[in-house]
């Protein structure tokens, strides 16, 4: 069983709609540099199944990345109600895939959000999806090789709560934490997660908030990568390597391979998520 990275960008992907600045022109002019919104898959080849963590607007292309496994979609875990993390659900209904009873694992407010949204609730009424309630800090057993545990994360919770996920295989464990407002009041939890897990995919939205000039960054809070690196500078080299930044904004040079920022992060001993990376957990 393995984790397969399906996307590494912020909700809008890379390049981002409406952006004609230098940061995005590279990808407009060279489609090979395109990046999908953040998402992971857990693939169980022995049972011919996979589960995805967040279902993005680019899910069509992301699931195609898994076609070589010849496995079927068997469940979806959603972190929160921001568009890059749930909007792919609309592809499961009558107009596109018309799937049947796909388990969608969600927290209580996220369930209320789906049930209260006419478009999404139609998926429930038509039995395309089956909403499976989660509780924070309660392990859910998917099969004899895989279990998952949700934990609450401080983030902009306008429409739902936000969670991260612990993915537990037979041999190794991983953390998926693409969105958080700040490490304030969460640093001890983060350090505990680093101590007790093998790989962590954590919020790398901005390297430095000065990269945003056209928006009020106070309204889109995320920790800066440079501050995360500083905060975790006391980690051992082995623990630093566990940290894989993910969820990069289009303005963040970490998303651009071999950029100075990309290399600076690696030089500090941390890792950068890449699409199609794999990590064995069982």
Features from the language model and the residues they span:
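Active-site metal-binding motif and surrounding structural segment of the metallo-beta-lactamase
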Residues: 48-52, 56-105
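Residues at the starts of beta-strands that form the adenosine-phosphate
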Residues: 2, 101-103, 130, 147, ...
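Cap/insert and terminal regions of metallo-dependent hydrolase folds
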Residues: 171-173, 180-277
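Short internal beta-strands
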Residues: 77, 102-111, 201, 244-246
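A short, active-site helix/loop in glycosyltransferases that binds the activated sugar's phosphate group
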Residues: 109-119
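Core dinuclear metal-dependent hydrolase active-site scaffold
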Residues: 1-66, 133-193, 278-282
């Amino acid at each position: 069983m393995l984790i397969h990275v399906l996307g590494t960008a912020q909700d809008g992907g890379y390049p981002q709609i409406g952006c004609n600045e230098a940061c995005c022109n590279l990808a407009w002019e060279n489609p090979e540099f395109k990046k999908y919104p953040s998402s992971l898959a857990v693939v169980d080849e022995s049972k011919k199944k996979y589960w995805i963590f967040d279902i993005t607007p680019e899910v069509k292309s992301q699931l195609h990345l898994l076609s070589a496994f010849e496995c079927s979609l068997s469940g979806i875990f959603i972190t929160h109600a921001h568009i890059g993390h749930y909007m792919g659900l609309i592809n499961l209904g009558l107009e596109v895939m018309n799937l049947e009873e796909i388990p969608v694992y969600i927290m209580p407010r996220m369930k209320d959000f789906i049930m209260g949204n006419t478009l999404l609730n139609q998926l429930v009424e038509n039995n395309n999806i089956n909403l499976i309630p989660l509780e924070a800090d309660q392990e859910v057993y998917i099969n004899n090789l895989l279990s998952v545990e949700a934990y609450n994360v401080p983030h902009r919770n306008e429409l739902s709560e936000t969670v991260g996920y612990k993915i537990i295989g037979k041999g190794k464990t991983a953390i998926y934490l693409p969105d958080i407002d700040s490490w304030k009041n969460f640093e001890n939890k983060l350090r505990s997660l680093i101590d007790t897990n093998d790989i962590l995919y954590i919020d790398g939205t901005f390297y430095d908030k000065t990269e945003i000039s056209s928006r009020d960054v106070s309204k889109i809070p995320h920790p800066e990568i440079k501050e995360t690196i500083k905060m975790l500078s006391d980690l051992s080299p082995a623990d630093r390597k566990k940290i894989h930044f993910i969820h990069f904004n289009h303005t963040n040079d970490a998303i651009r391979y071999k950029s100075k920022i990309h290399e600076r992060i690696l030089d500090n001993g941390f890792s950068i998520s890449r699409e199609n990376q794999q990590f064995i957990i069982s």
